[in-house]
């Protein structure tokens, strides 16, 4: 039984590529092992922002050679009338380096054919890995990739080295000039950039000594413990966000949780206006009051390093966050000085898509569609005006200062500004819910106005973009048509809606 360790040392890779790459590596190594009749007890794949690591535990080659049958010509053309071999048979034997005595006749789809049976010697683990590892790595696919140097390989980021160890000895392979050996690197600023690995057993310990925690699960646990510890000190709880946590785990090699504070004046802003710069732009965890759920004037950050000079780190991060919050307050104050309706005319200057008009024209289509669906779905007359109003205001926030700067807040700011402009709850809620669901498995719109407006918005976009031949092709979906279509279907199924149409 053998053990194999492969580290792919890369330049810092985007966090949203990491999980898919790990999955591909595991699947491709499993296929490599199966295809070559090897066995393995465990395939473990780990990662940090600067490396992907594969462990093959107890990998072994087949103990017996495999008997394979090679099909040749049919018996009907293999011999002449006197039973002598014809050219097709002689050519087949020559190509297989076989004799007439090696010929076996077998049935194949109802006819007799010539076969040669050979023993194929099983390859050793060393041979299989040496011949295939680099091609396997080359076969990993990404939404976007790059080339570097004169190599044929394309990857999300340049590969700078391979660490390749089989049974505590370097397993070399041709990697187009990329170094292959037993040298790895530690943390970019805290660790050594030349760590010699003598045995597979010492690998993770040596990384840890150089401020790299290889296990993403361990990094996640450390982050959660750190967040909870600071929460106890501040008397609050960090805002749970699985996507943010996953991202942070994948951008650090040695996590340390630190806490900073902000001026309470910023808490006068809508909660979403504070949370968005914290989470989406700075990757901080907001802190909530355990009883009220209101924001507290703190933020939690995960540093990629130890706690040395933590005050300087907190101060620097606070300056960046405060600058963002000042911008947000400035934009919010400007936007709030006008009713939401006053922005609608500006939509005439915002193109929806070439050939499909501007956003103002889209709102006109949404007004027509929601009116039609109100009748088709036998909805009460009491929501007719709210639907019309929600459709009219649906895109107004897109031209506000806040949404131009923080695009993630589309719909959300529409709801906030609608409420500040004394629009009804139905109207305000629909403006936000039109974009739901905004990802796979996300919440669906709940209000009837939100459901109808969301359906209308999705159908208008899908039909219009398909009319302009903007199709979904494989993994390419730049206009989120797949997400819109799946969202539309989920809304229809969830609410038992029979049918809606798109006509003007």
Each language-model region and where it sits:
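Amphipathic alpha-helical "coupling" segments that flank catalytic cores
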Residues: 1-502
């Amino acid at each position: 039984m053998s053990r194999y360790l492969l580290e792919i040392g890369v330049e810092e890779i985007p966090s949203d590529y990491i999980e898919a790459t790990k999955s591909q590596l595991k699947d491709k190594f499993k296929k490599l092992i199966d295809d070559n009749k090897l066995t393995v007890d465990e395939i473990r794949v780990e990662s940090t922002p600067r490396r992907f690591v594969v462990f093959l535990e107890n990998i072994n080659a087949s103990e017996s050679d495999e008997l394979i049958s090679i099909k040749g010509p049919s018996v009907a053309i293999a011999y002449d009338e006197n039973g002598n071999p014809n050219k097709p048979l002689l050519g087949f034997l020559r190509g297989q380096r076989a004799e007439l005595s090696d010929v076996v006749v077998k049935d194949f789809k109802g006819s007799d054919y010539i076969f040669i049976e050979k023993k194929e010697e099983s390859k050793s683990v060393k041979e299989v890995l040496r011949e295939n590892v680099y091609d396997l790595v080359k076969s990993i696919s990404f939404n976007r990739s790059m080339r570097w140097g004169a190599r044929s390989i394309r990857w999300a980021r340049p590969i700078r080295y391979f660490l390749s160890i089989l049974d505590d000895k370097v397993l070399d392979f041709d990697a187009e000039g990329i170094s292959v050996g037993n040298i790895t690197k530690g943390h970019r600023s805290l660790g050594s950039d030349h760590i010699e690995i003598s045995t597979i057993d010492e690998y993770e310990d040596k990384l840890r000594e150089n401020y790299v925690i290889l296990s993403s699960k361990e990094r996640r646990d450390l982050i959660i413990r750190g967040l909870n510890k600071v929460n106890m000190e501040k008397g609050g709880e960090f805002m749970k966000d699985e996507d943010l946590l996953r991202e942070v785990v994948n951008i650090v090699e040695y996590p340390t949780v630190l806490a900073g504070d902000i001026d309470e004046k910023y808490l006068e802003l809508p909660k979403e206006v504070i949370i968005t710069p914290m989470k989406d732009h700075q990757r901080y965890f907001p802190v909530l009051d355990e009883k009220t759920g209101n924001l507290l004037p703190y933020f939690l950050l995960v540093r990629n390093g130890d706690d040395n000079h933590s005050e300087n780190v907190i101060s620097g991060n606070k300056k960046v966050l405060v600058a963002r919050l000042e911008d947000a307050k400035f934009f919010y104050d400007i936007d709030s000085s006008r009713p939401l309706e006053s922005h609608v005319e500006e939509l005439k200057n915002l193109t929806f898509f070439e050939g499909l008009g501007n956003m103002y024209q889209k709102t006109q289509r949404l007004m027509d569609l929601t009116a039609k669906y109100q009748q088709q779905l036998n909805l009460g007359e009491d929501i007719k005006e709210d639907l019309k109003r929600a459709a009219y205001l649906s895109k107004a926030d897109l031209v506000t200062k806040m949404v131009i700067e923080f695009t993630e807040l589309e719909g959300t700011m529409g709801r906030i500004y609608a409420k500040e402009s004394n629009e009804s709850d139905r109207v305000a809620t629909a403006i936000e819910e039109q974009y739901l669901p905004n990802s796979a498995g996300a919440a669906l719109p709940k209000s009837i106005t939100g459901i109808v407006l969301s359906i209308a918005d999705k159908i208008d976009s899908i039909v219009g973009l398909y009319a302009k031949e903007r199709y979904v092709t494989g993994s390419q979906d730049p206009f989120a048509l797949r997400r819109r279509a799946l969202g539309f279907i989920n809304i229809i199924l969830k609410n038992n809606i029979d049918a809606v149409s798109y006509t003007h």
